[in-house]
């Protein structure tokens, strides 16, 4: 598995050489950010520059091509002006799932209010409902179902935050504080994540009913 601390040091060195004082924030998301990475985990790097142009994107791409494990690098890049103008409901997951490496997202987090959290739940539930119905009717894909349960786990994090004011990163910790319906979603997600057996019909019906419930709660 990648020694992420050493890899990030190399990444930061290259980034600073490439963009110098224009680097406003660097962070790590996903399994490496949570300390749950495996050999197959992507490296989800967040970079925010003072501003971002199409030329900057090409420059960043060239920089990434010079790094080890290029095939695993993904993540997000933007300008500060872009992220400060972003849809606040999207910023909820973005900010709380990002481990800072350089700089701070405090200015961005100040944009997240109760309304943004409620919208994160409602929009997430709507998207899951749509994806679930489409998959039940057309694709019938186990991979799509896994992705939908992953998305649902993010919605559960927002639900717990709404009720407690605490953002809980780790799924096993979510199990301790969720109600029965949300616990069932997290348990199923963890089963799928760990390669468990997929019951496409039952798991789809459970997810459909759960997303439908949260859409109605947003009325």
Question: Language-model features: where?
Answer:
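Catalytic core of pol beta-like nucleotidyltransferases
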Residues: 1-17, 33-39, 50-219
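Short gly/ser-rich loop at a beta-strand->alpha-helix junction or flexible surface loop bordering the NTP-binding
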Residues: 23-32
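Structured loop/turn residues at beta-strand edges in well-structured enzyme cores
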Residues: 21, 41
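Short hydrophobic/aromatic beta-strand micro-patches
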Residues: 46-48
């Amino acid at each position: 598995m990648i020694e992420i601390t050493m890899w990030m040091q190399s990444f930061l060195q290259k980034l600073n050489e490439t963009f110098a004082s224009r680097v406003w924030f660097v962070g790590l998301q996903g399994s490496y950010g949570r300390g749950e990475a495996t050999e197959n985990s992507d490296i989800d790097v967040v970079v925010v520059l003072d501003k971002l142009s199409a030329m900057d994107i090409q420059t960043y791409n060239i920089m990434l091509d010079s790094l080890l494990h290029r095939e695993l690098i993904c993540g997000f890049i933007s300008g500060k002006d872009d992220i400060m103008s972003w849809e606040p409901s999207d910023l909820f997951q973005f900010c709380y799932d990002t481990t800072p490496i350089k700089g701070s997202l405090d200015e961005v987090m100040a944009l997240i209010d109760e309304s943004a959290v409620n919208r994160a739940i409602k929009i997430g539930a709507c998207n899951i409902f749509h994806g679930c119905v489409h998959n039940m009717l057309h694709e019938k894909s186990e991979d799509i179902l896994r992705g939908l349960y992953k998305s649902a786990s993010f919605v559960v994090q927002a639900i717990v935050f709404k009720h407690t004011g605490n953002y809980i990163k780790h799924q096993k910790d979510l199990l301790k504080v969720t109600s029965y319906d949300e616990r069932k979603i997290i348990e199923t997600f963890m089963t799928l994540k760990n390669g468990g057996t997929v019951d496409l019909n039952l798991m789809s019906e459970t997810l459909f009913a759960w997303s439908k419930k949260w859409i109605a709660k947003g009325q």
